[in-house]
Amino acid sequence: MKFVDEATIEVIAGKGGNGVASFRREKFIPRGGPDGGDGGRGGSIFAVADRNINTLIDFRYARLHRAKNGENGRGSDQYGAAAPDITLRVPVGTVVHDADTGEVLFDLNRHGETVTLAAGGQGGMGNIHFKSSVNRAPRQWTPGKEGEQRRLRLELKVLADVGLLGLPNAGKSTLISRISNARPKIADYPFTTLHPNLGVVRTSPSRSFVVADIPGLIEGASEGAGLGHLFLRHLARTRVLLHLVDVSSPDPDADPIESAVENARAIVEELRRYDPELAEKPRWLVLNKLDMVPDPASVQQRFCEAFGWTGPVFCISGLNGEGTQELIWALQDYLDAEKRKEQITQDKADGSYVHEDPRFDTTRDAPPSGKD
């Protein structure tokens, strides 16, 4: 299925049905009084996040979504039927913008989360509501209200814990296929990856995290060169970025460190130009393709010194898996710690956080022994 992460749609909710002016007409009841019913509510349009959907391709072709109008009221105090609602299913991680103002209206980042895109119009009132002690035969009624109408831009930002960053052919797809069940296309030419790939890394039956692989960045990506800039938004929700650097060289006479450092600096600069906040995310350095390097320890030391890197660094081979287990467990421990911090922050905001004082321990007394 083709990956589509942007779409513009128009949603038109249904108009409410009109109320009616009607009077009771029965034999031997000459003055039956008003009995006009209300109009039905117009259909609303909702969006619900569905984890079983991973693309907005359905909205690329179905751009207009219109709900039906409510039925008009009738005599004998009969209310018009409400129109059925429309529910649009979108991927988890979809951001809904107002297409005209650019305002962010909704961010659906939880499975099952439901929002109202356009509310249906309220039905009009029948003349039964206008009866009073001084007006026993009202002829007033109100029309139904118009439903909401909006132009919306849907933008998908995939939900992942870890984002892979690097030049084309840095080994990102090889790494994600090594550590997860994702099977992206892998080949020895640039831009093999044409859309984001997600892989679930499971370290135990109860512990896992999600990795996102996007097309590689090239110099000038922030200005539209290559494909990577189209998908950098998918790294916005990640907790940590893995910057993959190819430290091998096809030319045995060339110094691979010099070109690797130059390429790594270009990636960081493109990241800063695209989004300074994204550039400030925690970033780990991953030196890849060490199976093609005679002295990995020396390469790591020389690269970090030349690059001026003091953060976390890992040396791996995505091809044979060397060093990947250490990377996986380090990521899992880091992500678990970050999630605990976020939970504590949320609990404090909700007022439900209970501080545990290590000076006080709770112990259970031994049960009393039976009588002799």
Curated annotation (Swiss-Prot):
EC number: 3.6.5.-
Residues of the Obg domain: 1-159
Record-level GO BP terms: ribosome biogenesis
Domain OBG-type G residues, every copy: 160-336
Residues that, per the record, bind GTP: 166-173, 191-195, 213-216, 288-291, 317-319
Main subcellular location of this protein, as a coarse class: cytoplasm
Residues covered by region (Disordered): 341-372
One Pfam family this sequence matches: GTP1_OBG
Nucleotide-binding listed as a keyword: yes
Database matches in SUPFAM superfamilies: Obg GTP-binding protein N-terminal domain, P-loop containing nucleoside triphosphate hydrolases
Similarity field: Belongs to the TRAFAC class OBG-HflX-like GTPase superfamily. OBG GTPase family.
Assembly behavior: Monomer.
Function: An essential GTPase which binds GTP, GDP and possibly (p)ppGpp with moderate affinity, with high nucleotide exchange rates and a fairly low GTP hydrolysis rate. Plays a role in control of the cell cycle, stress response, ribosome biogenesis and in those bacteria that undergo differentiation, in morphogenesis control.
Name of the protein described by the UniProt record: GTPase Obg
Taxonomic lineage: Bacteria, Pseudomonadati, Pseudomonadota, Betaproteobacteria, Burkholderiales
